[in-house]
Structure formats: structure tokens, C-alpha cells
């Protein structure tokens, strides 16, 4: 048993190293409207950390294009095939979501003027990204432990060191601080140990996963619709606007079920996305399905985090194992991606949650669904 635990710890450590070391090759082009010299500058090639954010790459990108930029104040933003990219979504998630067929390098366009404020929330560089990250971490802490005081009570020095470790991809530095927050790992037997619950009631001390309360895993889901007759992902039409993406914050509560040895990813997705799996046309979330605020509307740094109702989906769909038909909903699941991996639906969900989560302790899952053609009635 001890040897098995050692093996599992080794696998988890290797998975974390791969997640933190993952990168997307980027080829960044300067938009024609920002070019003031001839010939125009060549594109800039770089690696975008999967767990990183596009605004953090601006200093090196600007240095490359500095000789040709127009005078004035920079308002930097990125686009892909005409779609402005949300700066608070990690680079790896954007890539998994928008590139149905992986594009290497990923060709992006950078703008230094004309910020689309009607589409994107304003970003003031690193400070905005750090603020978004810390608020997401507070949200995750609230979901996992029932409050966010463990994050809010961090010293300024620890907050700064934690953020620097994320920016620099320093896993060891991150672990030195994040382990004190008691935000994981999640365990299958988390409902068994209840001895510490009574002693913690009425206390501000955060509870760690496994302390007797049901585990709640912070999850962000991105559901993208593709054309109904799509057989090859390289033929998927590009995303034209963010309204076609369902962006959902919804925690998954781990509940042990009789006869179930472990919770699969498929089971978790069916629970998280009843709108896509259930045969019911609609469903009102109960209290266990409330979600924290989205990154672009997160609470202030000096406030605690309280849950609110889940965002309503902009479209309905269903899910099942890869490429499986879904009854009564006219949808087909084409793909499920986590950290660039097309995951098997039978994989243990808690392994995915523990090992493929991002540094803010959220598990990001991209789901592609296609609308199935409906057969005409009466053979017509």
C-alpha cells in the first residue's frame, strides 16, 4: 500500500511538472493598422505558457515591434481570426477552445490601438492579471473550504511570491506557498473522516479537503458548438463571437455512491452539465450548483467571496463519451479537452482535478458539441 501511494505521488508530481511546463508555440503578427514603416515587421515567435496569460507577454512582444508602432498610449489586445481574445482566460484554455484542430504555431494578431471595450473588459497589464488571478484563487478557496479567509489572510510578501511563481512557471516556489492554503488534494474518501468537523464549527480556520465535509471541486467549463455535419475537426468553422461559447462556473460535489469504485470524468460531466446530458429541456440549479463570480466581475481584493447563481447557458447541448449520440437533445459530443489532452471519459475525475488543474485551483474543461441532423417526420 505504501509503495502504491509512493507511485501515485510520483505520477502526480510528474503530471504537475508537465502542466506547468506546457506551452503553446505562438506566431504573433502586428495588425496592419499599427504598422508605420515599410517593409512591415516580421511576426514574433514565442512560447506562451499554458498556465499563463496573454497580457504577460506584451513586454517582449512590444520590444519586437517597437520600431514600427504609432505614437500614443498603448491599449494592447489580441485576436484570433477576428475574435478578440479574453485576457483573463489562460493561454492553454484559449488554444484548446478556439483551435479545434491544433494549429502550430498558433497565429495571433496583436493590436496596440482600438481596444474593443464593448467586448473585452479593460486590462491594465500585469496588475489586472494578478487581480484576476487572486480573485479566482479566492473563489476556488470558497468553493473548497467554505470561505476564502485562507487566501485573504496571506501576507503581502506571500501573495507577491505566489504570483511571481505563477508568472515565472516556478512550480517549486508555488508549492512552498500554496500548500499552506489547504486547497487540496481531493480524495475519494473525503466523506469518511468527520472527527474534525465539530471542532471546526464556529471557527474561521479553513477546512481542507478530506476533513469531513463533501469535497467541492472548482470547475470552469467552456462549451463550444460546431457544425452538425463536422467529421474532421480541421473543418470546424472559427468562433465568430463569444456569445456562441457557453462559459460556466459550476463546482462539482464529490458524493460517494453505492457500488461505484470511483467517479469518472463522464459521471462528473453529466452532473456538471445537466443541460447537456439530461433529457429534460431545462433545469434550475439547486444550492449545490451555485457558482462564484466570473473573472471579469470578481469581488474586490478586500472582500470575501460569496457564491451566486450559475450563469444561464446561452444554448443547450448534451454530453457523453467522445463522439457519442445524446438522446432527445439533437447533440453529439465531438471532443473533451483538458490541458491540451483529449481525455478518456472513463478516467477518474479526481485524478484529473488534482493533477490537471491550473494554479488558481480551477479545473478548466473544453467541450465541443455538434448539432445532430434531425430525421424528417413521416419520411419526408
Curated annotation (Swiss-Prot):
<feature type="compositionally biased region" description="Polar residues">
    <location>
        <begin position="194"/>
        <end position="203"/>
    </location>
</feature>
<dbReference type="GO" id="GO:0050832">
    <property type="term" value="P:defense response to fungus"/>
</dbReference>
<dbReference type="GO" id="GO:0006995">
    <property type="term" value="P:cellular response to nitrogen starvation"/>
</dbReference>
<comment type="similarity">
    <text>Belongs to the ATG5 family.</text>
</comment>
<dbReference type="InterPro" id="IPR048939">
    <property type="entry name" value="ATG5_UblA"/>
</dbReference>
<dbReference type="GO" id="GO:0034274">
    <property type="term" value="C:Atg12-Atg5-Atg16 complex"/>
</dbReference>
<dbReference type="InterPro" id="IPR048940">
    <property type="entry name" value="ATG5_HBR"/>
</dbReference>
<keyword id="KW-0813">Transport</keyword>
<dbReference type="Pfam" id="PF04106">
    <property type="entry name" value="ATG5_UblB"/>
</dbReference>
<keyword id="KW-0963">Cytoplasm</keyword>
<dbReference type="GO" id="GO:0015031">
    <property type="term" value="P:protein transport"/>
</dbReference>
<dbReference type="GO" id="GO:0005776">
    <property type="term" value="C:autophagosome"/>
</dbReference>
<dbReference type="Pfam" id="PF20637">
    <property type="entry name" value="ATG5_HBR"/>
</dbReference>
<dbReference type="GO" id="GO:0034727">
    <property type="term" value="P:piecemeal microautophagy of the nucleus"/>
</dbReference>
<dbReference type="InterPro" id="IPR048318">
    <property type="entry name" value="ATG5_UblB"/>
</dbReference>
<dbReference type="GO" id="GO:0034045">
    <property type="term" value="C:phagophore assembly site membrane"/>
</dbReference>
<comment type="subunit">
    <text>Conjugated to ATG12.</text>
</comment>
<keyword id="KW-0832">Ubl conjugation</keyword>
<feature type="cross-link" description="Glycyl lysine isopeptide (Lys-Gly) (interchain with G-Cter in ATG12)">
    <location>
        <position position="138"/>
    </location>
</feature>
<keyword id="KW-0653">Protein transport</keyword>
<keyword id="KW-0072">Autophagy</keyword>
<dbReference type="InterPro" id="IPR042527">
    <property type="entry name" value="Atg5_UblA_dom_sf"/>
</dbReference>
<dbReference type="GO" id="GO:0035973">
    <property type="term" value="P:aggrephagy"/>
</dbReference>
<dbReference type="InterPro" id="IPR042526">
    <property type="entry name" value="Atg5_HR"/>
</dbReference>
<feature type="region of interest" description="Disordered">
    <location>
        <begin position="194"/>
        <end position="214"/>
    </location>
</feature>
<protein>
    <recommendedName>
        <fullName>Autophagy protein 5</fullName>
    </recommendedName>
</protein>
<dbReference type="GO" id="GO:0000045">
    <property type="term" value="P:autophagosome assembly"/>
</dbReference>
<dbReference type="Pfam" id="PF20638">
    <property type="entry name" value="ATG5_UblA"/>
</dbReference>
<dbReference type="GO" id="GO:0061908">
    <property type="term" value="C:phagophore"/>
</dbReference>
<dbReference type="GO" id="GO:0010150">
    <property type="term" value="P:leaf senescence"/>
</dbReference>
<dbReference type="GO" id="GO:0000423">
    <property type="term" value="P:mitophagy"/>
</dbReference>
<feature type="region of interest" description="Disordered">
    <location>
        <begin position="283"/>
        <end position="309"/>
    </location>
</feature>
<keyword id="KW-1017">Isopeptide bond</keyword>
<dbReference type="InterPro" id="IPR007239">
    <property type="entry name" value="Atg5"/>
</dbReference>
<comment type="function">
    <text>Required for autophagy. Conjugation to ATG12 is essential for plant nutrient recycling.</text>
</comment>
